[in-house]
């Protein structure tokens, strides 16, 4: 046995040392052998403990590095997902001339900035296609009842598909954008001279600038396509010297070269006149639209769809009490008291603003209707010219197009709960390390009290999270 320690110290391989350590411990019958002078087993045990400590430290370092790498990778993925969501949202707001309903479109003209168009575009498009919400009409800057039909058609033909963009916004000045076709733009950020916070801030600015340029490029492509088709239709009709009414008589002739080259997604002159001969002003944006807009349920005031999608609930806040004169900080209030009030009518301030829309049955063109080029105006005594008033009216609110308002409210409540928990932890920590404790007999009781506070806070947060999870599960199962 005298040669055993010498053999245990020779291997440089950590695994060999671990095996030798196991052998030594099994021989001794105790893993915690006390070192003693002249004891070979003592030296072996010390070396084994040192090797084990080094191995544990190395494994811990590797685990921490892997965990940190996984966390960074997860954050990067979340960031990419958020950016992709914003790009997809912007793409849903493109106006496409062939996506038309009753003479209007599925996307806004562009009276408001992208930041204000934070409604759910898929829901809005579905409502427009189902004729429950007025389409996004192209507005007129002015309207005159004395315009002749020729003058009105000329004005309508000159309308763009989308409002012009401000290509040189001040907030994006001197912000590099790089190659817009490439998803990666981290090479534009100098990581050697900027702090992590500055890098994150610059990344956000670059993404916004890139998205702004992408929106311009995407919409310009649609605008160009629209103008080309509109010019092509005009040239074909002028060469044939046929009116749109004569052209409709040739529909049954499939061999007609003129019809084969006409884009029937574009409106004919009859539809243009039907839409804009009786223009009406939206009291909010002061632009003129076809008369059959949305109307408020409370005071029967018109409102265009582009203005309606701007109206939303107030941000989560604590109830206002006029009789309350204290200056209590919001962080000290119960997060469950947070509320998100429905929007009021912009005209008469009636709570829970609601609108209704009555489509004109004879003007059912575009998606799920007659092609716009084939539209025929109804006769004077045609019942189809009347609005579809026999149907039960459908009422919509801002919650209809923003169904995630409750999720946002719960997120804000959770944020305040975490903030309160952090404040409690800091307060407890400060009490633990605060100087000036002269009476030692107070320390145990204070520590116990603080420990109880922390346990109560942890239980409270756990119960709140459980309630939220159960509520979310019930909603998903009900859907």
Curated annotation (Swiss-Prot):
Q: What does this protein do?
A: May negatively regulate the SNF1 kinase.
Q: Key word Cytoplasm present in the record?
A: yes
Q: Which organism is it from?
A: Vanderwaltozyma polyspora (strain ATCC 22028 / DSM 70294 / BCRC 21397 / CBS 2163 / NBRC 10782 / NRRL Y-8283 / UCD 57-17) (Kluyveromyces polysporus)
Provide the alphabetized UniProt keywords. Cytoplasm
Ranges where the record places region Disordered: 1-62
Question: Per the record, where are the segments of Polar residues compositional bias?
Answer: 32-53
Cell compartments where the protein resides: Cytoplasm
> What gene does this protein come from?
SIP5
Q: Name one GO cellular component term.
A: cytoplasm
Q: Source organism's superkingdom?
A: Eukaryota
- InterPro entries given for it? Sip5/DA2 (IPR039301)
UniProt similarity note: Belongs to the SIP5 family.
What protein am I looking at?
Protein SIP5
Compositionally biased tracts (Low complexity): 13-31
Predominant subcellular localization, coarse grouping: cytoplasm
Note the PANTHER family from the entry: PROTEIN SIP5
């Amino acid at each position: 046995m005298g040669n055993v320690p010498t053999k245990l110290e020779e291997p440089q391989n950590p695994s060999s040392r671990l095996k030798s350590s196991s052998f030594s411990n099994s021989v001794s019958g105790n893993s915690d052998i006390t070192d003693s002078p002249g004891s070979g087993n003592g030296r072996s045990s010390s070396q084994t403990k040192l090797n084990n400590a080094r191995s544990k430290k190395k494994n811990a370092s590797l685990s921490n590095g892997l965990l940190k790498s996984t966390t960074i990778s997860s954050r990067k993925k979340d960031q990419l997902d958020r950016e992709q969501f914003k790009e997809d949202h912007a793409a849903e707001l493109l106006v496409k001339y062939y996506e038309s309903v009753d003479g209007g479109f599925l996307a806004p003209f562009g009276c408001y900035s992208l930041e204000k168009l934070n409604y759910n575009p898929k829901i809005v498009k579905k409502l427009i296609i189902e004729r429950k919400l007025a389409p996004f009409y192209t507005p007129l800057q002015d309207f005159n009842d004395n315009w002749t039909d020729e003058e009105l058609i000329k004005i309508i033909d000159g309308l763009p598909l989308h409002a012009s963009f401000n290509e040189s916004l001040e907030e994006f000045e001197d912000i590099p954008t790089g190659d817009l076709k490439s998803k990666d733009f981290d090479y534009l950020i100098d990581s050697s001279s900027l702090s992590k916070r500055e890098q994150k801030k610059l990344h956000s600015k670059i993404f916004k600038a890139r998205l702004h340029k992408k929106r311009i490029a995407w919409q310009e492509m649609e605008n160009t396509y629209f103008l080309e088709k509109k010019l092509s239709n005009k040239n074909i009709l002028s060469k044939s010297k046929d009116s749109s009414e004569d052209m409709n008589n040739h529909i049954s002739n499939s061999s007609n070269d003129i019809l084969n080259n006409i884009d029937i997604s574009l409106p004919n002159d009859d539809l243009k006149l039907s839409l804009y001969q009786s223009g009406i002003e939206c009291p909010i944006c002061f632009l003129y639209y076809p008369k059959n807009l949305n109307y408020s349920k409370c005071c029967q005031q018109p409102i265009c769809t582009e203005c309606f999608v701007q109206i939303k609930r107030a941000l989560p806040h604590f109830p206002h009490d006029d009789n309350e004169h204290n200056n209590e900080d919001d962080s000290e209030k119960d997060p469950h008291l947070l509320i998100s009030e429905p929007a009021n009518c912009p005209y008469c301030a009636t709570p829970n603003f609601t609108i209704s829309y009555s489509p004109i049955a004879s003007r059912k063109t575009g998606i799920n209707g007659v092609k716009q080029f084939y539209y025929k105006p109804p006769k004077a005594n045609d019942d189809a010219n009347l609005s579809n008033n026999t149907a039960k009216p459908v009422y919509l609110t801002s919650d209809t197009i923003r169904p995630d308002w409750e999720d946002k409210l719960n997120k804000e409540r959770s944020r305040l709960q975490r903030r309160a928990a952090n404040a409690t932890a800091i307060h407890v920590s400060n009490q633990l390390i605060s100087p000036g404790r002269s009476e030692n007999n107070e320390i145990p009781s204070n520590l116990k009290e603080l420990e109880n506070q922390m346990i109560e806070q942890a239980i409270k947060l756990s119960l709140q999270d459980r309630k939220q999870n159960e509520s979310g599960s019930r909603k998903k199962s009900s859907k």
